[in-house]
Curated annotation (Swiss-Prot):
UniProt KW Phosphoprotein keyword: no
Cofactor: pyridoxal 5'-phosphate
Pfam family, one: PALP
UniProt lineage: Bacteria, Pseudomonadati, Aquificota, Aquificia, Aquificales
Source organism of this protein record: Aquifex aeolicus (strain VF5)
Protein name as it appears in the record: Tryptophan synthase beta chain 2
Length: 434
């Protein structure tokens, strides 16, 4: 079989929280003013109470509200595919599977948390949300989600992506989102960069600063983000929970699990339910290889330093313990805009530091070569971010070709690339550089 489908009734009813399964406690966020663990009231200035509770929860399973499940059912469960054409093309004995998150209305995994965050903000009496977006995947997911709960949504979009991907902006505006190129002249955080250079390419760190500044300055507004924090990764575990069931249906357990990493949410969403088996002490699963893939232009895990740093460029967030290239690092304007982040989710960083996760970084051109191979064998044009996972899956499959091992490889196709065709155009005409 090529495709493994679950019924609507099999959408997971609970999210998996990996926090209580960690072999040692996660270092808490610190208040930069006191260097003490941040007090909940500081977080409540920008997040609603239910999400702050989820951020620090020690419960392994957290119920998914009915209202969230109802919207999930528009596209979930998502299919698991066996990439047989790709296997044949590579001539590998490996079996390659991918979880297809591109089938959501916004075209990526991002609505899994966007819908949940919009719901919790709505029941907390919030009227407006601000956020940042790189390639526009997160901004479009939050615009999509907020319309169901009658919330206003303002998106600060990294300027290089705003210019590269006009159709993402149109998508956000179709779903009632207001899109502002960042850095902008509308916030103190943005103005500093904007006045130096009105065409500043921007970064996720700067856009986060702008969105947080606005949320903190208005009573009716909270901040929402698409990656990095524990509650965001929690909501994404629906991906891996479904994939576990589907892999059982296919009759396999993966030897290798792969995901692209920018902030860590799609990677964690697929891998954490499998890593939970390892953390619970299942000896049969301890050889599981979990591989995080990042761009060489922003090699956070592979070249970053494990330390406390700000989550944004200006220093408005608490300090979080993560692998970081420095909060003022501005990556080159690669097309995988969703991977241009100086840090990574603390949970992903902790598991990497403890040796449960491996990491690899690739050049942009080799990633697009893998993307085109995938499009020409499996038919789906992947998002540049997802193509990083495809490149790693191909490399793992080619290793199996050399060794003769019949490994089972599972990767996350986190989104489609139909709004990224200008990048493909450049690649196909030899104009894409590293």
């Amino acid at each position: 079989m090529r495709k493994f489908l679950l019924s609507e009734g099999e959408i997971p009813k609970k999210w998996l929280n990996i926090l209580p399964l960690l072999p040692e406690p996660l270092e808490p966020p610190l208040d930069p003013e006191t260097m003490e663990p941040v007090k909940p009231e500081k977080l409540l200035a920008i997040f609603p109470e239910p999400l702050v509770e989820q951020e620090v929860s020690d419960k392994e399973w957290i119920d998914i509200p009915e209202e969230v499940l109802d919207i999930y059912s528009l596209w979930r469960p998502t299919p698991l595919h066996r990439a047989k054409n790709l296997e044949e093309f590579l001539g590998t004995p490996a079996k390659i599977f991918y979880k297809n998150e591109s089938v959501s209305p916004p075209g990526s995994h991002k609505p899994n948390t966007a819908v949940a965050q919009a719901y919790y903000n709505k029941i907390s009496g919030v009227k407006r949300l601000t956020t940042e977006t790189g390639a526009g995947q997160w901004g479009s997911a939050l615009s999509f989600a907020t319309q169901f709960f009658d919330l206003q949504c303002r998106v600060y979009m990294v300027r290089v992506s705003y210019n590269q991907k006009p159709y993402r902006r149109i998508l956000m505006e179709t779903w009632k989102g207001e899109v502002i190129p960042s850095p902008s002249p509308y916030t103190n955080a943005g103005r500093k960069y904007y006045e130096e250079n009105p065409e500043h390419p921007g970064s996720l760190g700067i856009a986060i600063s702008e969105a947080i500044e606005e949320a903190a300055s208005r009573e009716d507004t909270k901040y929402s983000l698409g990656s990095v924090l524990n509650h965001v990764l929690l909501h994404q575990t629906v991906i891996g929970l479904e994939a576990k069931k589907q892999m059982e249906e296919a009759g396999y357990y993966p030897d290798v699990i792969i995901g692209a990493v920018g902030g860590g949410s799609n990677f964690a969403g697929l891998s954490f339910p499998f890593l939970a088996d390892v953390l619970r002490g299942d000896k049969r699963k301890e050889d599981l290889k979990v591989l995080a893939v990042e761009p060489e232009a922003c090699p956070t895990l592979t070249k970053g330093e494990y330390k406390y740093d700000f989550g944004d460029s200006v220093g408005l967030t608490p300090l979080i313990k993560m692998y970081t290239l420095g909060h003022d690092f501005v990556p080159s304007p690669i097309h995988a805009g969703g991977l241009r982040y100086h840090g990574d989710a603390p949970l992903v960083c902790k598991l990497y530091n403890l040796g449960y996760i491996d990491a690899v970084a690739y050049k942009q051109t080799e990633v697009f070569e893998a993307a085109v191979t995938f499009a020409r064998t499996e038919g789906i044009v992947p998002a540049p971010e997802s193509a990083h996972a495809i490149k790693a899956a191909i490399d793992e499959a080619l290793k199996c070709k050399e060794t003769g091992e019949e490994k089972v490889i599972l990767f996350n196709l986190s989104g489609h690339g139909y709004f990224d065709l200008s990048a493909y155009d450049k690649y196909l005409h030899g104009e894409l550089t590293d």
